[in-house]
């Protein structure tokens, strides 16, 4: 996941657990982990996780992964930009798409 999204992934819960189904909510979506677990997800990927959500998920046996707000939203935004550009030819309207990357936090300090 880290290689695909280009960001560090923090894992809360059992890092050795065998995972067959993952739920996901981009951005700050850690409050959605119970809905994913109810659908059979053994792990949940989000951009930002609240501390108590991580504790609750871990206690329920769900591995919670935090991969960065921007990193989890960018793939969807870029796909939407491409789709809008393609729809321009079908709908006959003027669509201008601008792709940019702005990160709220530039560096991590230890």
Where are these regions (language model features)?
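Hydrophobic structural segments
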Residues: 1-110
